[in-house]
Regions:
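Residues forming the flavin
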Residues: 1-222
Length: 222
């Protein structure tokens, strides 16, 4: 809701990655009119790495999620054109860079380095996009059935309140560990440990591994 120019909550064809995931799981990827979409466009870094939203950090999981969802769309709807607008693709983790290449070479997903500046509705319930290809230095005008906003991760209100009351609140409302590199599960409060996405944006796998590390550190401290 901090990116009004993209039309979320105003135009029905503008959805979030979370809403698209529900469509994929139920095999119900349709446009506003209930038809199979001819084109779906992703926009990366919505609410992350953004001066306007105040979140300067990378949310880590968005790039991988967009590529995964783009592939799933092409598997279900091979005739649908899929575009991904990005600033930088950060494919964290083993095998994800290969997945990015597979999306291009096997499934024909179109990756465009650039930003979408504005979105508006068309008479036939599609979404008109004004964008720029920053590699080519060219303005772009596209009509797409669905504009998918890859929303970032932020600290929940519960995390902010708990971290503040415990005296371990850090940047952007996340819990602050003692040292991100050496004592990442420890805090400045003795006996208080942290793990997972309460510290920073984190994938499910990273969160599980971090929780295991925290459990070991707790046992060692007893």
């Amino acid at each position: 809701h901090q990116k009004e120019e993209l039309g979320y909550g105003i135009y029905k064809g503008v959805i979030t990655s979370i809403e698209l995931e529900k469509m994929i799981k139920t095999d119900s990827i349709v446009n506003v009119n209930g038809d199979k979409p001819k084109q779906i466009t992703f926009l990366q870094c919505v609410g992350s790495r953004d001066e306007k939203s105040g979140n300067h950090y990378c949310s880590k999981v968005c790039c991988v999620t967009a590529v995964k969802q783009a592939i799933e769309i092409k598997k279900i709807l091979p005739e649908t054109d899929v575009y991904v607008f990005y600033m930088d693709l950060r494919m964290w983790g083993q095998g994800f860079e290969e997945m990015y290449r597979t999306a291009q070479e096997k499934y024909g997903v179109n990756f465009v380095r650039g930003r979408i500046s504005e979105a508006a509705a068309t008479y036939d319930n599609r979404v008109q996009i004004k964008a720029e290809d920053t590699l080519m230095g060219l303005p772009l005008n596209l009509n797409t059935d669905l504009l998918v906003l890859m929303v970032g991760m932020c600290a929940s209100e519960g995390t902010k309140q708990l971290a503040k009351s415990a005296g371990i609140d850090g940047l952007y409302g996340f819990a602050q560990s003692k040292s991100e590199h050496l004592y990442d599960n420890f805090t400045e409060q003795d006996g208080l440990f942290v793990a997972g996405a309460c510290k920073r944006p984190s994938s499910v796998n990273d969160t599980i591994q971090d929780a295991r590390a925290a459990a070991v550190n707790i046992l060692n401290s007893i």
